[in-house]
């Protein structure tokens, strides 16, 4: 895990980069932080007992993603990592997907498909990954990869994390404890929902973390802001998830949650309230899979 300084440096940089021109404007800061992150990963790999033929899948930290502009930028220098650890490195996953007419995200559906088959999970099933951004994979057929549906659907932890970082010395809302102790501001919540629903650029959302901001809760207490943002996040995920799964209305469907957001008990409780009762939220951990490492395992699989 990154130390607190590196963690804050990454998120402070993300908050500066809102358009492609900023990548050039902050190129020195990007280069320095990227080097530090790469060295950190090299030190971790050196501690592992892996043989010389091992292939390393190196994803890095996304700081800007816009497939419409044919760009996705992650912090992490694959060539430098190769020099430092003398291992074969596969990197620039998202950039190469975009260059091959993909969207660059999500890239985990094939791995979700593999999990559903190896764990004999009842199909159809929906995987919901709540990281900084939330994305889904719908697995309908165990044989046919072309039947996979996967897309980003809204914010995950990004709004809550940004609020907590800005207003405390914590990295995130542990287990939703802040949200559980606060009160939702109904007026601000309804205004934010209305603005999101009616925004002219909604169809142009890339669901990069910079598509969203937390300015609308400015002035609230730490806990009230966390509560309001948690409910707002759950409402967007619930709305987009319901739209994506509307063909399953009236049918029982399991939604398996992975990613750090699954630990936020308030977020998950609120999300269930925004979904039809026939959609069952379950933790992927219930299948003896560590939900913290689905994404990293997926990129190892892709590598």
Indicate residue ranges for each PLM-predicted region.
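Short beta-strand-loop/turn "lid" adjacent to the catalytic site in phosphate-handling enzymes
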Residues: 24-78
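A contiguous, well-structured pocket-lining segment that forms one wall/lid of small-molecule binding clefts
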Residues: 169-254, 264-279
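Glycine-rich nucleotide/cofactor/substrate-binding loop typically near the N-terminus or early
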Residues: 1-40
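Short glycine-rich phosphate-binding loop at a beta-alpha junction
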Residues: 52-60, 248-261
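Glycine-rich phosphate-binding/hydrolytic loop that grips phosphoryl groups
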Residues: 231, 282-303
């Amino acid at each position: 895990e990154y130390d607190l300084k590196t963690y804050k440096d990454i998120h402070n940089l993300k908050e500066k980069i809102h358009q492609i021109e900023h990548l050039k404007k902050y190129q020195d800061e990007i280069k320095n932080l990227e080097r530090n992150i790469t060295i950190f990963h090299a030190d971790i790999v050196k501690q592992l007992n892996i043989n010389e033929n091992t292939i390393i899948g190196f994803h890095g930290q996304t700081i800007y993603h816009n497939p419409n502009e044919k760009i996705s930028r992650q912090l992490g220098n694959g060539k430098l990592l190769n020099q430092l650890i003398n291992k074969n490195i596969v990197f620039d996953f998202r950039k190469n997907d975009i260059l091959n007419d993909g969207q660059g995200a999500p890239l985990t559906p094939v791995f979700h498909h593999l999990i559903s088959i190896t764990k004999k999970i009842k199909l159809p099933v929906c995987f919901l990954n709540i990281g900084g951004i939330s994305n889904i994979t719908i697995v309908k057929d165990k044989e046919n990869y072309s039947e996979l549906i996967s897309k980003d659907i809204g914010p995950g932890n990004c709004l809550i994390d940004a609020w907590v970082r800005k207003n405390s010395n914590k990295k995130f809302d542990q287990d939703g404890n802040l949200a559980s102790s606060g009160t939702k501001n109904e007026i601000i919540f309804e205004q934010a929902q209305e603005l999101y629903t009616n925004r002219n650029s909604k169809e142009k959302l890339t669901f990069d973390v910079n598509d969203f901001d937390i300015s609308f809760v400015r002035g609230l207490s730490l806990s009230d802001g966390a509560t309001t943002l948690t409910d707002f996040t759950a409402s967007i995920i619930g709305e987009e998830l319901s739209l994506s799964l509307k063909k399953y209305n009236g049918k029982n469907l399991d939604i398996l949650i992975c990613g750090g957001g699954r630990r936020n008990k308030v977020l998950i409780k609120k999300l269930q309230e925004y979904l039809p009762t026939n959609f069952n939220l379950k933790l992927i951990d219930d299948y003896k899979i560590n939900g913290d490492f689905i994404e990293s395992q997926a990129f190892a699989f892709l590598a």
